[in-house]
């Protein structure tokens, strides 16, 4: 990558700007520039596309996205220490990098959209799941994004793509399965990062289902939270606060079943009966 874009190696950038990763911000910087290119390529063709990136840090993934031809990258970065390093990338790619300093959980992402949008990010571990849920549950659908290519801890990635009767199946699997086609792209070993996390990471690619099963996002979330909050109990017990056996009878679902056995369609049916 250094030869490809003419910018210095990431280790040099991190050392020059004193960018030790902060655990409190969920930071793990990805140093392998071959891997950052692989992540960017997983998102598909980037020419003419605006890419939203969360937590760019020193900019390894940002560089890959720009080198592969994205029209623009809008990078959300909370850590002000990273801004000078990102400014150097912006100078190398004039008018193609906008950096927004702030908390990604408080950003209006739809307002940042400029034409076709893909979200590509090595998400901070401490906010990654909440950001994904926020992107999945807007009232308007199809969403503002064409696809999401995101890195998570492998455990979270398995939950995203899980299906019924899978040990990893839960609220996240239902929400992702309802509105997206999600797939695991590839794993990333701990030694690719600084500092190395204790777990393997994985890249997940999600594309929106244009017309998902009609259902209220808020009600579906309420049903899945109740059902998986006591996942080992029968549904008649775990869904008691929402109507229990009466709700299940209305939806035509056996009250002796457990949450992990229900399909996305059955969860939507329950939500629509509330």
Curated annotation (Swiss-Prot):
It comes from Sinorhizobium medicae (strain WSM419). It holds the Pfam family RrnaAD. It is an enzyme of class 2 (transferase). Belongs to the class I-like SAM-binding methyltransferase superfamily. rRNA adenine N(6)-methyltransferase family. RsmA subfamily. SMART domains: rADc (SM00650). Coiled coil: none annotated. It catalyses: adenosine(1518)/adenosine(1519) in 16S rRNA + 4 S-adenosyl-L-methionine = N(6)-dimethyladenosine(1518)/N(6)-dimethyladenosine(1519) in 16S rRNA + 4 S-adenosyl-L-homocysteine + 4 H(+). S-adenosyl-L-methionine binds at residues 28, 30, 55, 77, 103, 122. Its EC number is 2.1.1.182. Specifically dimethylates two adjacent adenosines (A1518 and A1519) in the loop of a conserved hairpin near the 3'-end of 16S rRNA in the 30S particle. May play a critical role in biogenesis of 30S subunits. One of its GO terms (cellular component) is cytosol. SUPFAM superfamilies: S-adenosyl-L-methionine-dependent methyltransferases. The lineage of its organism: Bacteria, Pseudomonadati, Pseudomonadota, Alphaproteobacteria, Hyphomicrobiales. Disulfide bonds: none annotated. It is found in: Cytoplasm. InterPro entries: KsgA/Erm, rRNA_Ade_diMease-like_C, rRNA_Ade_Mease_Trfase_CS, rRNA_Ade_methylase_Trfase_N, rRNA_adenine_dimethylase, SAM-dependent_MTases_sf. This is Ribosomal RNA small subunit methyltransferase A. Keywords: Cytoplasm, Methyltransferase, RNA-binding, rRNA processing, S-adenosyl-L-methionine, Transferase. GO terms for molecular function: 16S rRNA (adenine(1518)-N(6)/adenine(1519)-N(6))-dimethyltransferase activity; RNA binding.
């Amino acid at each position: 990558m250094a030869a490809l874009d003419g910018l210095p190696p990431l280790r040099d950038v991190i050392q020059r700007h004193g960018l030790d990763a902060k655990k409190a911000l969920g930071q793990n910087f990805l140093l392998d520039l071959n891997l950052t290119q692989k992540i960017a390529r997983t998102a598909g063709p980037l020419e003419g596309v605006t890419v939203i990136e969360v937590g760019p840090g020193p900019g390894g993934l940002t560089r890959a996205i720009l080198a592969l031809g994205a029209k623009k990258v809008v990078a959300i970065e909370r850590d002000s220490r990273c801004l000078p390093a990102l400014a150097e990338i912006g100078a190398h790619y004039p008018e193609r990098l906008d950096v927004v300093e702030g908390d990604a959980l408080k950003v209006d992402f739809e307002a940042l959209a400029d034409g076709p949008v893909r979200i590509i990010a090595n998400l901070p571990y401490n906010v990654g799941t909440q950001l994904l849920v926020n992107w999945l549950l807007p009232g308007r659908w199809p969403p503002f994004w064409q696809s999401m290519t995101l890195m998570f801890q492998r455990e979270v990635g398995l939950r995203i793509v899980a299906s019924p009767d899978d040990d990893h199946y839960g609220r996240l699997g239902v929400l992702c399965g309802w509105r997206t086609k999600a797939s695991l792209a590839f794993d990333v070993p701990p030694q690719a990062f600084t500092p190395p996390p204790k777990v393997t990471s994985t890249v997940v690619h999600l594309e929106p289902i244009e017309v998902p099963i009609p259902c209220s996002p808020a009600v579906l979330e309420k049903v899945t939270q109740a059902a998986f909050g006591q996942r080992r109990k029968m549904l008649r017990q775990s869904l008691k606060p929402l109507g229990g056996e009466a709700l299940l009878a209305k939806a035509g679902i056996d009250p002796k079943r457990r949450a992990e056995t229900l399909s996305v369609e059955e969860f939507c049916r329950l939500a629509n009966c509330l």
